[in-house]
């Protein structure tokens, strides 16, 4: 992935929570790309690994990923849900999955005093942004 493409993806990911910010905007996620790899055995697909930090009080806006997303919590406590699914609270060592048709309705730090950190591995279409507005 070119530097500009990775930078663009990072900016899109970091701005996902700003799609419809509230009047008193909560802190935004800090997203850092770790690696990208074309999946040569799966034509048209690539893997993108990112680290995400939710500062205390972070609340993401509703969005979706045209990807298979595998989340692994490293630190803190987060709350996640997709449309039609149950809200789950995750702590270090726990995982969460989002499919390409899921709408990510809840993504937030459960704490207003401590950060939360997690890694996400996305298997996605090449050339498609990792975060998209909910439809």
Each predicted region: which residue ranges?
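A short, N-terminal "cap"/entry segment at the start of jelly-roll beta-barrel domains
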Residues: 2-48, 81, 97, 115, ...
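Short acidic-glycine-tyrosine-enriched beta hairpin
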Residues: 54, 84-101
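Extracellular/periplasmic catalytic domains that process cell-envelope and extracellular macromolecules
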Residues: 42-44, 64, 72, 89, ...
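Extracytoplasmic
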Residues: 44-49, 65-68, 85, 101, ...
């Amino acid at each position: 992935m070119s530097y500009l493409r990775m930078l663009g993806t990072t900016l899109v990911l970091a701005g996902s929570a700003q799609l419809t910010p509230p009047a008193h905007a909560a802190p935004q996620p800090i997203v850092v790309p770790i690696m990208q790899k074309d999946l040569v055995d799966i034509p048209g697909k690539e893997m993108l690994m990112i680290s995400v930090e939710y500062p205390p009080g972070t609340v993401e806006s509703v969005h979706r990923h045209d990807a298979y997303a595998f989340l692994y919590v490293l630190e803190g406590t987060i709350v996640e849900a997709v449309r039609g699914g149950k809200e789950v609270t995750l702590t270090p060592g726990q995982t969460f999955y989002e499919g390409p048709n899921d709408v990510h309705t809840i993504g937030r730090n459960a704490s207003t005093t401590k950060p939360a950190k997690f890694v996400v591995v996305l298997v996605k279409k090449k050339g498609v942004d990792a975060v998209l507005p909910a439809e």
